[in-house]
Swiss-Prot record:
Domain of life: Bacteria
Organism, as annotated: Escherichia coli (strain K12)
UniProt-recorded name of the protein: Uncharacterized protein YuaU
Keywords: Plasmid
Length: 213
């Protein structure tokens, strides 16, 4: 990762923090008030949009994780633009303190190791053509509960400046193609319309513009 991208990551994370404190925004979006908790999907989706808004042909995907903890089911999402794994909200978990975790896919680092732990089981054929299209089992790490299922649940395709989710995870959804962006929250599931996400992205871009002055 070059210095420019790292600087942009820092600015974007700072913008997220400022946005979570904005009363006029959080009044309508309660899921942002506890940032970084519960915001991994929203942060990862909009980060990918931010990094590719210059029109670059950057290949990117969103990696979704799901695990069971007793009666509850939980999820976490990271971004994977180009050849890097990026997690902007890992510090919501006990034992993790870095505001940004970014590492090359080939590095065998913290995120890469967790996502490539054996055994691996392929998801439905023909849904996502990707080397990382796997369901993995990983062991307990630090203070996090054991993750039972990790599956890549989104392949993002940029078309007319919009993201179209085109893959299916049989563990989570029943549809192969979603008519709108579906959000896996960190606790349970919810969906945000494209207009809502556009508004959030616009708010963050305004904040980023102010930071760059």
């Amino acid at each position: 990762m070059n210095a420019d991208t790292w600087t942009r990551l820092q600015a974007f994370r700072h913008a997220l923090e400022l946005t979570s404190c904005e009363a006029s925004l959080t009044a309508g979006y309660d899921h942002l008030k506890d940032f970084p908790a519960g915001c991994s999907e929203l942060a990862s989706q909009t980060l990918t949009d931010y990094l590719t808004e210059d029109g670059s042909n950057l290949y990117s995907c969103i990696v979704g994780m799901q695990w069971d903890n007793g009666p509850g089911r939980y999820g976490h999402v990271i971004a994977a633009p180009a050849r890097d794994y990026i997690d902007l909200t890992l510090d919501q978990f006990p034992g993790y303190h870095n505001r940004i975790v970014a590492e090359p896919v080939e590095s065998g680092g913290q995120l890469a190791a967790d996502l490539n732990r054996e055994p691996a089981i392929s998801t439905a054929d023909g849904i996502v053509a990707s080397a990382s299209d796997k369901v993995n089992y990983i062991t307990e790490q630090k203070n996090r509960q054991p993750m039972v299922i990790i599956t890549e649940c989104y392949k993002l395709i940029r078309m007319t400046a919009r993201f179209i989710p085109m893959c299916q995870s049989s563990q989570l959804f029943q549809h192969q193609i979603f008519p709108r962006l579906f959000i896996i929250s960190d606790v349970g599931s919810c969906s945000l319309s494209r207009n809502t996400l556009d508004r959030l992205a616009t708010d963050w871009k305004v904040t980023l513009s102010v930071l760059s002055l």
